[in-house]
Amino acid sequence: DTTEQFEHFDIIESEKTKGEIFISPDIAICDECKEEMFDPKDRRYLHPFINCTCCGPRLTILDALPYDRERTSMKEFPMCPDCAKEYTDEKTRRYDAQPVCCNQCGPQVYLIGRPERGRAAITYTRRLIREGKIVAIKGIGGFHLCCDATNEEVVCRLRTLKNRPAKPFAVMAKDESVVKRECVVTPEQEAILTGHQKPILLLDRRSDGGLASSVAPNNPKVGVMLPYAPVQLLIFSFLIATVSYTHLTLPT
């Protein structure tokens, strides 16, 4: 028997050395975190930055290698005792999850120029979108401009703001049922749409759908995606089913 016998297995901290290493891209919120976020009994109930070892920000929050919390933007948010316990316990789903946080120790959402913070800020944002306003929302990798994708007037206003007269906008739908209501979706397309990458998928529009025509003028197709960040899911709670989603960039 040539099998080596070992007496110990240790998980040690990273060392800062030169070399090539794979850093995971950001991963859309997993089903387990989604379930926790909407569980009133969970301590991360409605937490807009919930994550675990299976999902959440990775490359976007990294400042330097190796990938450890003190070299990410989360270094500004020390873990509370409960999060620290999960982080150091290899039996938990958040063992060694660098961005781990909760409502007590993690970042909080806020509105620029308004007093609302936390859940109140999300509630007010929902109200603005329902009222036909355009909102800049900071997600995992930057800002996006959002509005009600069924409101023709506000979508046209967004086109004027972006100086984009005809280029199609992407649409974020609340869930798969909304996508199927607005577009023709094959099983293969649904599998891609609901995967952990949450890509923008080009789909055929239904003639009886409710999207504003200005979302993709004179185009039988529309780019659709599902929410990938917790804050997006929270904004969709008790809200309209679709929003027009565009990067906050100036056209070249």
Where do the model's predicted regions map?
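Conserved small/polar residues in nucleotide/adenosyl-binding loops
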Residues: 246-252
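A phosphate-binding glycine/aspartate-rich beta-alpha loop in the early core of alpha/beta enzymes
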Residues: 142-205
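Short acidic, glycine/serine/threonine-rich loops at helix termini
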Residues: 7-8, 43, 60-66, 146-151, ...
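Non-transmembrane, aqueous-exposed alpha-helical and coiled segments at domain scale
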Residues: 82-87, 98-99, 104-110, 121-122, ...
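Intrinsically disordered, low-complexity, mixed-charge
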Residues: 1-103, 107-110
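Residue-level signal for inorganic ion chemistry
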Residues: 52, 102, 139, 158, ...
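Glycine-rich N-terminal segment of FAD-binding domains in flavoprotein oxidoreductases
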Residues: 129-143, 147
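His/Asp/Glu-rich metal-coordinating catalytic cores
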Residues: 3-25, 180-184, 190-194, 202, ...
